[in-house]
Amino acid sequence: MEVNVYNIKGEDTGRKVTLNESIFGIEPNDHAIYLDVKQFMANQRQGTHKSKERSEISGSTRKIGRQKGGGGARRGDMNSPVLVGGGRVFGPKPRDYYFKLNKKVKTLARKSALSYKAQDNAIVVVEDFNFEAPKTKVFVEMTKNLKVSDKKLLVVLPEANKNVYLSARNIEGANVQTISGLNTYRVLNAGVVVLTESSLKAIDNILI
């Protein structure tokens, strides 16, 4: 599959690049995508949730009423889970949600996500670029020139670029990632994926 190469002014350079079929043209594997996204989301969790059990509630331990003869249910102290303000039974406890995923599955998931974007014609390739200084205005102009300003945007760079990152940081729906940090969730969450020529070459080395 061939796509045109544009510059940041939105002009067609007259050159074309070929998207690797083994990355951008495979039959997407939805289960691999599910597993990779599940792992990504789980690993973002802090896992600090906590509720108090009966023994952790600060309150009197005096028995509310007599055990028998009251005509109602048996009750212990005010910390009982059946009463408002009492402890919680089997409530959440701090835990680590982190889990690992096989490298082959993660690679397949990223290939599948990129293939979905290629099928939707949602991949734009641009010449390598750099900003002289962090300027949000310059980044916005680039998105308008490429006609992607109205979409969620994922810009993939070959390596970290502070000026580009800072220029996009304050723009809603815009995300800048390096090729090493590319993940399935970010790709699927974007309406359009913008790849530089160097990023496209680097993807071949990482995902093949």
UniProtKB/Swiss-Prot annotation:
Disulfide bonds: none
Keyword rRNA-binding in annotation: yes
Pfam families per record: Ribosomal_L4 (PF00573)
Highest taxon, organism lineage: Bacteria
Keyword list, A-Z: Ribonucleoprotein, Ribosomal protein, RNA-binding, rRNA-binding
One of the GO BP terms on file: translation
GO cellular component annotations of the record: ribonucleoprotein complex; ribosome
GO molecular function terms listed in the Swiss-Prot or TrEMBL record: rRNA binding; structural constituent of ribosome
Region ranges (Disordered): 44-79
Family membership: Belongs to the universal ribosomal protein uL4 family.
Quaternary structure note: Part of the 50S ribosomal subunit.
Described function: One of the primary rRNA binding proteins, this protein initially binds near the 5'-end of the 23S rRNA. It is important during the early stages of 50S assembly. It makes multiple contacts with different domains of the 23S rRNA in the assembled 50S subunit and ribosome.
HAMAP family (UniProt xref): Ribosomal_uL4_B
Protein name per UniProt: Large ribosomal subunit protein uL4
Organism of provenance: Bacteroides fragilis (strain ATCC 25285 / DSM 2151 / CCUG 4856 / JCM 11019 / LMG 10263 / NCTC 9343 / Onslow / VPI 2553 / EN-2)
